[in-house]
Amino acid sequence: MLSIFGCVRAVPRVVQMSARRTLKVPAPSQSIPDVEAFLKTIGRDCSELTETFENKWENLFEWDSKTLKSKGVSVQQRRYILHQAQKFRNGEPVKEMKKGKKSFFGGERNRKATVAKWRAEQRNK
């Protein structure tokens, strides 16, 4: 691979990221005093993971996605828990966000074709 200076490099340079920034661990609130209450408040069956976090408040806010993956937490739950933990850290209210539901006719891209097929089937009945 040729660089702009005309030198040939066999391996591209890897840019090192700076050291991880330390994230603050917020104090528990009156409505959410422990890990179990937090996971129950955010819903989506996250309360089943109380043992995974060893019921330690620090683990909930210090563990990253890699750590949760090694503990066997699914991708969707990892992302959801980390998002809700960040909201709590920022002082925003924590509440359950329901999962979205797909339309009967599918996604937006194929909707016209799907609706046309459905209407044709209804006419033929």
Swiss-Prot record:
Keyword Mitochondrion: yes
Transit peptide: 1-10
Pfam family, one: SAM_Ribosomal_mS41
Keywords tagged on the record: Mitochondrion, Ribonucleoprotein, Ribosomal protein, Transit peptide
Family classification: Belongs to the mitochondrion-specific ribosomal protein mS41 family.
A GO CC annotation given for this chain: ribosome
SMART domains linked to this entry: IGR
Stretches the record annotates as Disordered: 103-125
Job of this protein: Involved in telomere length regulation.
Location in the cell: Mitochondrion
Superkingdom field: Eukaryota
Name the UniProt record assigns to this protein: Small ribosomal subunit protein mS41
